[in-house]
């Protein structure tokens, strides 16, 4: 479990029946908590909803129950001053938002959808963020993505496509990516303008100038000084713009990262004919994921790295049925 000492203290306060309900929730939440590098009690309301959606529950009753259990845990954390805030954001979630968490809804994009989206995006800034997240570049507060420079991309092109990434908390990490990813990132580093609304802006301002520097992800040029590394909000804004253009409400950095994991699972499924823990361990190694415990990470990955999900998202590629994207 993420932040296991705190969670075990909470479980010690519960009845045996409640522990049996909470422990699986904590176990399944570990991947999402690790990606955001924070405990559930510090999640935003949107992150809480994303977590609930990842459970893929099929009845509104089960969704409500999960929210109620999460709310109790957050209340406890606030009462012991563990949370950074004083408001339980789980209690601000509406019934309408809960219905949107019901299972059998699309949570991830496939590789073919990624390519189709890239073809329709006019800004390399957008293409780069989408592709880099899909191939596993993220880090604490997206620091690997935000610190990525043109030189790092060029070095990777000369070193078997292996990027040297820098996380603000965990330091250096190596990750092998595709040639397509590097080409897109290089183009983004050379981009000087950003077309608003993916080139469909109707106002007087249709494009903005970007700061000219060596970073792949850039901020808008303003009269204020600050031409260095962009903030994490630039990533949020880029993903929001992509979501709005394609009318995709589930797109977040986390779901894009998981989409990349699922694509790798599909590739391994074609090779092995099965999705088991060896496949999940392979994905952890291929993406060089930072996890405290591989065993626990593999357990958490079972929710989305399984044959049902692979068959659901890659049915056409596997010849199971015809699908329309």
Curated annotation (Swiss-Prot):
Pfam families recorded: MrpR_C_cat, MrpR_N_CB
Recorded superkingdom: Bacteria
GO MF annotation list: DNA binding
First and last residue of the signal peptide: none
UniProt name for this protein: SPbeta prophage-derived uncharacterized protein YopR
Organism: Bacillus subtilis (strain 168)
């Amino acid at each position: 479990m993420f932040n296991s000492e705190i969670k075990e203290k909470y479980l010690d306060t519960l009845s045996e029946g409640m522990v049996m309900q909470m422990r699986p929730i904590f176990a399944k939440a570990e991947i999402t908590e690790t990606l955001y590098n924070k405990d559930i009690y510090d999640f935003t309301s949107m992150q809480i909803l994303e977590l609930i959606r990842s459970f893929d529950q099929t009845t509104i009753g089960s969704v409500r129950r999960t929210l109620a259990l999460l709310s109790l845990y957050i209340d406890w954390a606030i009462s012991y001053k563990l949370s950074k805030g004083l408001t339980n954001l789980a209690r601000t979630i509406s019934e309408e938002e809960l219905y949107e968490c019901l299972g059998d809804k699309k949570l991830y994009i496939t590789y073919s959808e990624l390519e189709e989206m890239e073809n329709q995006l006019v800004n390399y800034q957008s293409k780069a963020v989408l592709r880099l997240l899909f191939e596993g570049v993220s880090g604490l507060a997206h620091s690997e993505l935000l610190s990525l420079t043109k030189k790092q991309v060029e070095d990777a092109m000369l070193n078997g496509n292996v990027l040297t990434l820098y996380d603000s908390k965990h330091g250096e990490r190596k990750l092998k990516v595709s040639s397509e990813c590097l080409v897109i990132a290089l183009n983004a580093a050379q981009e000087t303008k950003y077309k608003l609304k993916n080139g469909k802006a109707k106002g007087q301002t249709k494009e903005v100038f970007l700061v000219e520097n060596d970073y792949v992800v850039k901020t808008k040029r303003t009269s204020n000084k600050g031409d260095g590394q962009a903030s994490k909000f630039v990533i949020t804004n880029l993903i929001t713009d992509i979501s709005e253009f394609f009318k995709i409400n589930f797109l977040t950095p986390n779901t894009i990262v998981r989409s990349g994991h699922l694509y790798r699972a599909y590739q391994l499924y074609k090779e092995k004919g099965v999705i088991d823990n060896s496949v999940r361990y392979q994905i952890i190694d291929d993406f060089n994921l930072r996890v405290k415990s591989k065993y626990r990470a593999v357990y958490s990955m079972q929710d989305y790295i399984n044959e049902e999900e692979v068959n659901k998202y890659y049915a056409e590629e596997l010849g199971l049925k015809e699908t329309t994207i």
